[in-house]
Amino acid sequence: MRALLARLLLCVLVVSDSKGSNELHQVPSNCDCLNGGTCVSNKYFSNIHWCNCPKKFGGQHCEIDKSKTCYEGNGHFYRGKASTDTMGRPCLAWNSATVLQQTYHAHRSDALQLGLGKHNYCRNPDNRWRPWCYVQVGLKPLVQECMVHDCADGKKPSSPPEELKFQCGQKTLRPRFKIVGGEFTTIENQPWFAAIYRRHRGGSVTYVCGGSLISPCWVVSATHCFIDYPKKEDYIVYLGRSRLNSHTQGEMKFEVENLILHKDYSADTLAHHNDIALLKIHSKEGRCAQPSRTIQTICLPSMYNDPPFGTSCEITGFGKENSTDYLYPEQLKMTVVKLISHRECQQPHYYGSEVTTKMLCAADPQWKTDSCQGDSGGPLVCSLQGRMTLTGIVSWGRGCALKDKPGVYTRVSYFLPWIRSHTKEENGLAL
């Protein structure tokens, strides 16, 4: 009973003192306070210290900038409160049991410097292209980009910007080798990606296939995407688009002036032969594509010059997560596969003689990620001599991410003469 009375008396003293002017005492002890925060303690518990933060900051060390609504650069020093991914899913807390098993978490020795703590706010501790967080997807946490915009997108330049030019294979975000499997991305990471849609009689529009911008006026895709509806008037093309059915800042919309399908295209039970198409595009104003941080051309390879087998390459698209899915994902996805030799791909338990020298095979060594329905026509890009190069066009395959059934791609280096003969603008192509 005496112990209980003593505790009650202590509580009364603390509460009464907190109403006075001497509740907090600034102390020289190091609390690691940031952004002008001061280290303080209570009069009766001088061995307990914490940070007293300026108005716009919060967190244990005043490390959270409550006023920050956008990120600068790649967001490495972003300390705002965005806490959802681009699909609107909540981020996991950096100190949650699930995240503590990952590489970046709140218990790291450098967590404070990286902005990680007892919160679920988006951060960029590993210098990726923008802030991200861990999101629970199924049974495991996945790295996902965050719903927070670049401060530069909302700034008006004080002086006229330099004229932008197309520089094939260059992207504002650094190459990342980490669409069954894979991860969500934004168009800045694949600025040559073209989203192709088909108009219907009732006025509705549906996504058909992907494509790649090879010059300001030309997109290359796969013939099988258009063979059933070959009228150019049926199609529209978007460049600079990250989301399937909603607007992306800076995107451009184009009509199809000319649709060229390969005259020798054919399809077997499974394989597609000469599966390549060209779309000449123009806007309502009659202009071709204009370069920006979200719109860029992809380099074309030289004749028969393909990366060596085993090279890691990127595939991009709005393809389904699984072949049995009904809907396409709303956000653009990207993943990495490795090129497979023709000899291996022509093995009987792979595809046998269905694979020809006009095709390339690529797959994830663990068979966990692959192109899938809806990725057709999209790019397979590989780094070649320091530039991202269009090595293949998504064409066909059995299922999605099935063991011993890699994705098969149209071999772009084989079709260079065909591309040049139809575009008639070799100097304007991204060679």
UniProtKB/Swiss-Prot annotation:
Chain residue ranges for the region called Binds urokinase plasminogen activator surface receptor: 34-57
Chain segments carrying region Connecting peptide: 152-178
Post-translational modification: Phosphorylation of Ser-158 and Ser-323 abolishes proadhesive ability but does not interfere with receptor binding.
Annotated CDD domains: KR, Tryp_SPc
Positions of glycan attachment: 322
Any one Gene Ontology cellular component term annotated for this protein: extracellular space
Annotated ranges, domain Kringle: 69-151
Main location class: secreted
Domain called Peptidase S1: residue spans: 179-424
GO molecular function, one term: serine-type endopeptidase activity
Keywords from the UniProt entry: Disulfide bond, EGF-like domain, Glycoprotein, Hydrolase, Kringle, Phosphoprotein, Plasminogen activation, Protease, Secreted, Serine protease, Signal, Zymogen
Leader peptide range in chain numbering: 1-20
Post-translational modification Phosphoserine, affected residues: 158, 323
Entry annotation: catalytic residues: 224, 275, 376
Listed PROSITE patterns: EGF_1, EGF_3, KRINGLE_1, KRINGLE_2, TRYPSIN_DOM, TRYPSIN_HIS, TRYPSIN_SER
GO process annotations (BP): fibrinolysis; plasminogen activation; regulation of cell adhesion mediated by integrin
Protein's cellular compartments: Secreted
Reaction equations catalysed: Specific cleavage of Arg-|-Val bond in plasminogen to form plasmin
Positions of the EGF-like domain: 27-63
Enzyme class: hydrolase
Enzyme Commission number(s): 3.4.21.73
Gene3D superfamilies: Laminin, Plasminogen Kringle 4, Trypsin-like serine proteases
Family: Belongs to the peptidase S1 family.
Assembly description: Found in high and low molecular mass forms. Each consists of two chains, A and B. The high molecular mass form contains a long chain A which is cleaved to yield a short chain A. Forms heterodimer with SERPINA5. Binds LRP1B; binding is followed by internalization and degradation. Interacts with MRC2. Interacts with PLAUR. In complex with SERPINE1, interacts with PLAUR/uPAR. Interacts with SORL1 and LRP1, either alone or in complex with SERPINE1; these interactions are abolished in the presence of LRPAP1/RAP. The ternary complex composed of PLAUR-PLAU-PAI1 also interacts with SORLA.
Protein name in UniProt: Urokinase-type plasminogen activator
Protein source organism: Pongo abelii (Sumatran orangutan)
